[in-house]
Amino acid sequence: MGEDGSDMRFGPILKRSFYERPTVEVARDLLGKVLVHGPVAGIIVEAEAYLGGDDLASHSARGITERTRVIFGPPGHAYVYVIYGMYECLNLVTEPDGKPGCVLLRAVEPVAGIEIMRQRRPAAKKLEEVASGPGRLTMAMGITRALYGADVTRGSLVVREPLEPRAIEVQVTPRINMNVCADWPLRFIVKGSRFVSGPKSMG
């Protein structure tokens, strides 16, 4: 850490203004950024946008509840929920305060604290399996419901610029494992990345 508390491994933390934009733009622009939680970090290679309004696949379609209240709040906060009664999923809240929107982080490429991540994911036989998938990502990075509502512009869970940005090609596909709005092209992946979960390309 630097004297000002900065993480010398990576670039600056993304500011709130990064998230206070249309959800689709944020989802696309998150690719190549670095998700950091304490000693572990990974380059974001897959993200899905969840919109307000008519997006019935989004939790915000049910309105404001105790579970979804953070989605309707200020941007740049963590929305963490559980699926199948056991796996946490990490979303980053987008759009201006009061307008629902979030981005589900589906996969990262481990780049720091790799041994810690492997220990948390003993079932993973290959590095590309450690954090490929929403539940695997949170498990490998030690992200739990305790981080619900956390401000990702400060604290232990943040998204940073990489020190040396990579040239990446973004591929857009429909979201996966959807029962509604299944054909909406709101999944963004780093083309060619072996760390992406599910289909490496669709359509």
What are these regions (language model features)?
Residues 2-203:
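Conserved, well-structured core segments that form or line functional sites
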